[in-house]
């Protein structure tokens, strides 16, 4: 099983991009009122949630391999990443309720989607510091 964990660095970029694309698409809907972008957002968050599950599984496998040293940074990355994956699943599930027009449903979906994007950004940053070090951006 540890072999599949080695795919985490490859797979992790897909759900990040999909969640960010979903959030960007929904922002376009809010700003321009063009509902076609909502379809883009929903497709991306659903795909991002599915890929997030696969990526989280490979991340857990990778973290338990002898290649990775346990650290507080790893634990933060692990749990913020899990929260992001769970939030993505929540946003994807909430997107199915949007076929019935409701301002409340739209607000809850969008709030969950934007929180998901924030969690994914934080988890991605933490993962980057695990790979490149905390001083990567320092001159």
Locate the predicted segments by residue.
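Polytopic transmembrane helical bundles with strong interfacial aromatic enrichment
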Residues: 1-139
């Amino acid at each position: 099983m540890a072999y599949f964990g080695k795919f985490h660095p490859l797979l992790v970029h897909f759900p990040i991009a999909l969640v960010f694309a979903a959030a960007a698409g929904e922002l376009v809907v809010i700003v321009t009122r063009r509902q076609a972008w909502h379809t883009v957002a929903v497709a991306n968050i659903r795909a991002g949630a599915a890929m997030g599950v696969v990526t989280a599984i490979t991340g857990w496998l990778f973290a338990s391999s002898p290649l990775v040293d346990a650290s507080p940074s790893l634990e933060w990355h692990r749990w913020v990443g899990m929260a992001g994956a769970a939030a993505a699943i929540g946003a994807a599930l909430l997107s199915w309720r949007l076929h019935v027009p409701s301002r409340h449903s739209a607000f809850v979906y969008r709030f969950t989607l934007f929180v998901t994007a924030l969690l994914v950004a934080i988890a991605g940053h933490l993962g980057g510091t695990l790979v490149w070090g905390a001083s990567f951006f320092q001159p």
